[in-house]
Amino acid sequence: MYIGGCDLDKHWANFQSDAAAYEYRKIVKGEKVGKIGYKLSQGLADENWDYISLQQASGKSGKYETYTVLADLIAGIKERCPKAKLLWHQTWAYASSSTHESFPDYDSNQMTMYSSIVTAARQAMTNHTDLSLLIPSGTAIQNGRTSFLGDAFNRDGYHLEVTYGRYTAACTCFEMITGQNVVGNPYAPETIDPQVVKIAQNAAHYAVQKPDEVTDLVDFKQPEISDTDLKAPIYIDFGPTSLSATPWNNITSHQESSTTSWIKDVENNYTNIGVRVLDGFTATHAGVGSEPASPVTVDGVEFPLTAWKDGLLVKGEKNQGDVGPGRIEISQLDVARKYNFTILAIRFNGSKDARISSYKLVGKTESAVKEVKTGIKDAASFAAANFEEYIAKFENVEPDSEGKVIVEVKGLDTGSAAEGHINALCISLAK
């Protein structure tokens, strides 16, 4: 039963008034089905439920004083579903860089928020004996953050990353409810790397064993890297909604990140090269929904729809001047080598001249600035497009003395818009 950001008070009010305020999301024959305008009473009566999970809204999860109606809600559910076991879902702390409006309630400190959530969840379990099990997803996520994935379990600073983030929470539910050790379980979505599957499963397992404290995943501090040399190109897809399958790496958040993501090459091998969003991006672009399903092939690379439809934005107001830069850091490059960078920027359903993005690379030296007019108006324009015009290519780029190259993205004020963006990035060794 879904309402975005819904707290216990609203759930209880909806229960009392039998308000048709929910989207009822259900998995039917392997497919998620959503029904709008549902009542709690309808959802509770729809199945002979074995388990019913409750939780507080994320920003209030660490504030037990906001749980005042929990006893009433439990009693109401037990009256309608007396045989169901009730679960309490311990939510996770926000990313350290989160801009969520509730984060300052915890001094914008991840560990303060985590500790508060653990304390409140345990108090709920102690004070409400009808709660049968605690699902320690918050601890599982915090465990995962001790691995080489770092503080990269949220796509926007508070919602879970949609592949391994959600999978970690799912593994926690599985082991807690079934009692079966999830480590080694053969099921995982194909979009998750096998090394990351191990992190998610171990993070969940240790959370079930120790739900109120963080377990340091000492065996997962860095990925297994077969060769420190970059043998094959690297493809990076930026954007929140359409994840690209192997061989693409996905960066879903525009938020400043304190964690470097380890990157795989097109042969599906981890490299020692890392990427992170430094600062300056203001939003993400999810696409418009009417994009052609066709890939874009340019510069010898096939960019699937999932790579070119969405991206990261640096956005301002028209007639107020250029905006940016948004900055992305590529790190741990070989200082003795040179690299080629190809940036793709497409804004579907936009006039070609309305949005102009400019790009500069800063390594051992600063590159020349390159501009891309990013708009493609419609499917006919897409079919006729010369996609060479939608890339910015930088060759023989040398990293700085620390092995870093910074990608800078600006939006030029055209009078129609001031918006820069990046959809995808390809990196290869210069020949």
Show which residues each predicted segment covers:
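Structural recognition of the beta-strand scaffold that forms the well-ordered cores
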Residues: M1, D50-Q55, K85-Q90, L133-P136, ...
